[in-house]
Amino acid sequence: MHDIKWIRDEPVGLITALVRRGGGSDEAKSAAEKLVAYLIGLDEQRRRTLTDLEGKLARRNAASKEIGQAKAQKDEERASRLMAEVANLKADIPTLEALAKDWEKSLDNALAAIPNAPLAEVPPGADEHDNVEKSRFGVARSYAFTPKQHFEVGEALGQMDFETAAKLSGARFVVNKGPLARLERALGQFFLDVHTGEHGYMEVNPPLLVRDDAMFGTAQLPKFREDQFFVNTVDGIEAISAETKGFETFSDEFKSKLTEAMSYQGRWLIPTAEVPLTNLVRESILSEEELPLRLTACTPCFRAEAGAAGRDTRGMIRQHQFTKVELVSITTPEKSAEEHERMLACAEAVLKKLDLHYRVVTLCTGDMGFASQKTYDIEVWLPGQGAFREISSCSVCGDFQARRMNARYRPAEGKGPRFVHTLNGSGVAVGRALVAVLETYQQENGAVTVPDALLPYMGGLKTIEKLK
């Protein structure tokens, strides 16, 4: 979330950032100028109301003291007049307090919907076609046969079952079994071992269900509510129904009551371990000596994929449930750029050990995530698809998430607390890594060779063959 003081003092800064995210068009500039004017207007109303409130509170306190003085001087007329004034002030103050809260809420809601400002070095652009390649590792392998896509390989092995998964859960789920399930587990364990043993990350086993505040802190809410899974108990659902009864469906009052009830009763399934890992420092003040704090977790992740209709409908590329190893760093503003490059190198390292061909691209202003200041995507080569596909996204968020979480640190030189900088990245997506291994290491006879780096995790199995 942005600092309203920064917007008030440097409105052009936010306008420029929003125009860059909008592709630099005149329409984007006009919309940005209107939004910033609206924000400044809300802030002026809020501050004016607070000034009025503080004035009335101060006058109430002063008048209350004057009442005592008037009574001590036997000036009953003055005391009576002051008591009437205090009574009027007491009647006005709750109204002003409520109004101040309303302005504060309106401003916070408006600020919460604004994306982070791109760093100056982020390339301009509208979408993924404008992303800039940064580096490349390895070369695409040659095959004496036409390589198959991962789902063709997995189904032919009899170890990847989408049909049964659909019976259990619907579309965009998979059942992996046998050696293929072990290979998937091996990938997650391998990634964790490298990041904890070689890269200095601390492993965390976090909750998979989180509250509204956690999702807000990392900026999944309110912007991406439609892409999340929300869960509740039967009693909770009935309570929500009772809370919203009598309100016109989809009215503002209904939505407000629904949001309030959901916040109290339910939980969100995490779309990424970034949510619980980053929120470990919410509402806290760390010492500078504790930073950088580097955390990793291997968790299931859950996404509704609301905007993915018609895309990647076959296979494991885009699923409602998938496993991912996440990397999170909490650091100081001075070190965040360096930490971003380090995180990228850590994510690349596991792919290099698997000898997978990949490239790194810097996302343009129009393709980067809502909370990001700058993002690198790692795209792995899939021989069966004949295309590079994202397997990791590493982002630096500055203090954008820290402000939403109120996560701070105390500088070593003894100055007042400052907001931390947060970074997150996939280290990497386990399901997509499995896809890459199946397509890269497939053999003409349909078997799959286990990469050397994974052999210690496979119990002596060197080749995955069709189940008999």
Swiss-Prot record:
L-serine binds at residues 272-274, 326, 426. Keywords: Aminoacyl-tRNA synthetase, ATP-binding, Cytoplasm, Ligase, Nucleotide-binding, Protein biosynthesis. It catalyses: tRNA(Ser) + L-serine + ATP = L-seryl-tRNA(Ser) + AMP + diphosphate + H(+); tRNA(Sec) + L-serine + ATP = L-seryl-tRNA(Sec) + AMP + diphosphate + H(+). Disulfide bonds: none annotated. One of its GO terms (molecular function) is serine-tRNA ligase activity. It comes from the Bacteria. The keyword Protease does not apply. One of its GO terms (cellular component) is cytoplasm. Its EC number is 6.1.1.11. Pfam families: Seryl_tRNA_N, tRNA-synt_2b. Pathway: Aminoacyl-tRNA biosynthesis; selenocysteinyl-tRNA(Sec) biosynthesis; L-seryl-tRNA(Sec) from L-serine and tRNA(Sec): step 1/1. CDD domains: SerRS_core. It is found in: Cytoplasm. Gene3D superfamilies: Bira Bifunctional Protein, Domain 2, Serine-tRNA synthetase, tRNA binding domain. Belongs to the class-II aminoacyl-tRNA synthetase family. Type-1 seryl-tRNA synthetase subfamily. NCBIfam families: serS. Homodimer. The tRNA molecule binds across the dimer. This is Serine--tRNA ligase.
